[in-house]
Regions:
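Active-site catalytic microenvironments in core metabolic enzymes, especially phosphate/sugar-handling
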Residues: 1-226
Length: 226
């Protein structure tokens, strides 16, 4: 398949103009080949993923996280990424995580999604644990029930104040730092950067599976519970 036609499918879903100014979504490595036969879908491209792609005879990688520096060895295969544009678009990264919990969210701003549902912290914890087994709960005030939950997949603590302004009593995101946890006045869940975003591979797959042969990269969180 023509690789530019393939990318057009992704960009029709998550337009590049949605990406943040600092982001580098789009073509990370663009070779001279026009047609591709097999594509690998990954959350993050690193040396292991690149070797997987080579071993699986993939001639292109589509990823969520971009590479900010390109090892010379990576330049022999097309690499395309959809990062913050995929985070913002409806049906993207955060929406996919919320859907996996069996919940429905509404957009608030560009990145935040809000779920309005009366639910106990215990029940919400159980839902989250099924998707993110190593998630951590922060509940400094012993709150038993919540009714307005803000979500941001990946690293979302810069949206904490926005969640508070929207009168949310719970915030679900990843990469929560210690002092953020100590200062938290609402319920928070650190669900992990990897765990909250890995499901985006299903979105990529759904977009292109009928157009080309797809291989799903074998990826694991770099963090291990000891």
């Amino acid at each position: 398949m023509n690789k530019y036609d393939l990318v057009k499918i992704i960009e029709n879903f998550a337009p590049l103009e949605l990406q943040e100014k600092w982001d580098c979504s789009g073509w990370i490595v663009e070779t001279s080949q026009i047609d591709v036969k097999r594509v690998m879908i990954a959350l993050t491209v690193d040396e292991k993923i690149f070797k997987q792609a080579l071993n699986k005879n993939c001639d292109m990688i589509i990823s969520h996280h971009p590479l900010f520096s390109i090892p010379l060895a990576f330049r022999g295969i097309d690499i395309y990424c959809a990062h913050t544009n995929m985070d913002k678009v409806l049906g993207g990264t955060t929406d996919t995580f919320i859907e996996a919990l069996g919940l429905n969210g509404s957009p608030e701003g560009e990145f935040l999604r809000i779920v309005e549902k009366n639910i106990s912290v215990k029940e919400l914890s159980q839902k989250i644990k099924k998707v993110s087994p190593n998630a951590r709960l922060i509940n400094n005030n012993g709150i038993q029930n919540v009714s307005k939950i803000a979500f941001c997949a990946g690293s979302g603590m810069d949206l904490y104040n926005e969640a508070i302004e929207n009168k949310c009593d719970c915030f679900v995101t990843g990469d929560i730092k210690y002092h953020n946890a100590v200062d938290a006045q609402i319920v928070m869940f650190d669900v992990g950067h990897f765990e909250s975003e890995i499901l985006i591979k299903k979105v990529f797959y759904g977009l292109i599976k009928d157009k080309i042969e797809v291989v799903i990269a074998d990826e694991n969180s770099p963090f291990k519970t000891i």
